[in-house]
Amino acid sequence: MVLGQKGNLHMAKTEKKNKLKVLFAASECLPFVKTGGLADVAGALPKQLCRDGADARVVLPFYKPIKEKYRMQCKHVCDFILRLGWRSQYCGVEQLTLEGITYYFIDNEFYFGRDYIYGNFDSSEGERFAYFSKAILESLPRINFMPDVLHLNDWQTAMVGPLLKLQYAADPAYAHLRTLLTIHNLRYQGIFDRGFMDELLSLGAPCFDPNLLEFNGCVNFLKGGIVYADRISTVSPTYAREILTPYYGEGLDGVLRARENALIGLINGIDTAYFNPADD
């Protein structure tokens, strides 16, 4: 395409305008932080989506363990006060472009200024990722990037789906936004005390229902994501079939069978540039 020609220039602008916009929300991402396979996917998939013609970006927490060489390259985009239940918390957004991919980092020292990525699986962990989920949605109009698809991953970002449908549905800015939830490991679900419903999520008693967020008397973040996501994917077709059964379903096989028409299994690939034996 020769951009110097008027017609082709118009075509280029149209193609850019019509690009599918995807925001990949993850609790970890290479090359910044990694504890498991989610970081590999979050690091590789947005790059491939961009090569396929999409405008794919990533949002993750601004953890303290992120190396200084990356932190120094970030630019401050915005900051605001985030309402999380009765709490008012600072929320900053930092931005870094690396290898053609735009990364947004949600900054809050209280939640992410620790020496570790994940902590004990207690209420403080639930509060951290309830904050992260709410911050993702609140930051979208402020970063001037409203995606077509929010790609959520595991329980840490699954609650974005219920929050979007229950608290932002009436806002025209969010009306077109759709969610895809990828389940990497069904065993980890983000199960916390019922108090999260009112104190942090402000979702109210009607959502504490066995068909929605309630799970054995508690709030289940991943279950909420499964119920409210527009589409659900897993890391392989085999795993997608397995989690529909009681043996592999980790107590969520019933809700997954109810969403079976929205569920698909996609085999994970690898970033052959990053995992290249010739460079080892």
Model-derived features with residue positions:
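Short, Lys/Arg-enriched N-terminal segments with co-localized hydrophobic residues
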Residues: 1-10
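Catalytic cores of nucleotide-sugar-dependent glycosyltransferases that transfer UDP/GDP/TDP-activated
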Residues: 11-280
